[in-house]
Amino acid sequence: MGKKNLYLLGAILLVVAAFSSCASQPDKAVIERYFHAIQLNDVTTMSTIAVSPIDIDFKSYEITKLGETKVQPAALPEMTKKEAELKKKLEDHVGPTLDAKDVLDLAKEELDNARTRPAKAAAQKKVDDLQAKYDQEYELHKQLQKDYNDAKSAAAREEEISIFSLGEKEVPNIRDLTGEVQSKEAEVKVITKAGAEKTYLFQLRLYNLKDEILNRTRRGRWVIPDIKSIS
């Protein structure tokens, strides 16, 4: 075999090896594609890879740590259930909170109408006791409201990432789909154009979900739900 043919064969083997590496590590490849898109200022591609894409100033980068893949059941059905339960708790507590406020307001009227010192003292004690009870109910209601808001936001975020991984614009029954979610973290060291060193943490996820009613499997792709600077 001639020297020219040997060079050609070597080049082909390098290309095949590169493609094989990407195929065997699609999670790593998605980070590489993201940085390539940044390099080209290709915002459209960045937006198809990351849920919330950010521009990163870099001259060079290196994936310094690629964590183990964690596999967990799809969380969205349980998150949706929790959201509904907290919503009901919040709604059920509206009545007791308003009742406590009404009783307190009546006690304050009694205090305003009290004329004798003993009557005023008794009315004031009643107001103080009812105020404490109302404050307790109000603080509980605020906590229930916070818990519900947090659960609602978390479920909405999970829904967004699930649909993004599936590559769909919308999936009407996404909250009912079962299946599994693969996740991992990657640390990327970046040298900026000014020569500074920074480290970014990439969250990676892949959703493989199943519609139990239609007996249909929906296979997702590795995506980047979050990127943050850690140093």
PLM region spans:
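Sec-dependent bacterial lipoprotein signal peptides
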Residues: 1-20
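Bacterial signal peptide processing site
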Residues: 23-25
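Nuclease catalytic cores
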Residues: 27-31
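Short, well-ordered alpha-helical segments enriched in acidic and aromatic residues
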Residues: 42-57
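Short, charge-rich amphipathic alpha-helical segments embedded
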Residues: 54-72
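Alpha-helical linker/edge segments of TPR/alpha-solenoid repeat scaffolds
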Residues: 74-91
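Exposed beta-sheet edge and beta->alpha loop/turn motif
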Residues: 88-231
